[in-house]
Amino acid sequence: MLLTKMLQTFGEYLVLMGRVFSRPERLRMFWKRYVKEMAALGVDSIIIVLLISFFIGAVICIQIKLNIESAWMPKWVSGYVTREIMLLEFSSSIMCLILAGKVGSNIASEIGTMRVTQQIDALEIMGVNSASYVILPKIVGMLTMIPLLVIFSTTSGIVGAYATAYIGHIITPAHLTEGIQYDFNQWYFWMGVIKSFFFAFIIATVSAFYGYRVEGGSVAVGKASTDAVVSSSMLVLFSDLFLTQLLS
C-alpha cells in the first residue's frame, strides 16, 4: 500500500515536471519572474547563510583544536580540517538542508496559497500554462542562487575560523593559513558546487509539487509546507550519499 502510494506520488511529480518544461511562457514574462524569484529565494537567504556558516566555521576550528591537541599532531591541522568540512559537507549538504526549511516552505506555502485562492485556476482559464508560469522561474532561480550561496557559505566559514585565530587566539593565523592551504584539491570545491545544483533542483521541484497539489484551505497549505520540507530534506540526504559516492 505504501509502495503504491509512493509510486503514484512519483508519477504525479513526473507529470507536473513535464508540464513545467513542456510549454514555457514568453521570455519577457519569464525573465521578470526569474529575477523576482532570485531575489526572494536567494538574495533574502544570504544573511542567514553567512551568519550560520561564520559561527559553524569558528566552532569547528575551536573543537578540532581543543580535541585533537597532541604533540604528534601538526599545529595547522585545525585549519585543514575546517576547510575540508566546509568544502565537502557543510556548505553544500548541511546548508542546503537549512535552506530546504526556509526556501522549501516558502515555495510550498506561496504556491499552495495561490491554489486555494484559485489564482492558478484563473491562469488556466486564461490559457496560461500555470505550472510553467509559477514553478519554472523558481526552479531556475534556485539553480542560479544556491551554488552562489554555497560559495558564500564556504568563504564565511573560513572567515569564522580566522576570527577565532585573531580574536580568540585559539590558533595562530599563520598555522590556520598553512592548514587551509595544505594539500588543497580543487575538485572538492567543484564537487560541492555540483552537488548544490542537484539539491537546488530537488528543493525547488519537490516544494513546488506539494504546493501545487494542495486541496482545501489554509490547514492544507500548512500541511503541504511541512510535507515539502520533510520530503525535500530526506531526498537531499539520500542524493548526498549517492552523489558523494559517485563524485569522490
What positions do the PLM features span?
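Short, membrane-interfacial amphipathic segments enriched in basic
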Residues: M1-K32, Y210, E215
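Final/C-terminal transmembrane alpha-helix of multipass membrane proteins
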Residues: V221, D227-L243
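A hydrophobic alpha-helix feature that marks transmembrane segments and, especially
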Residues: L97-R115
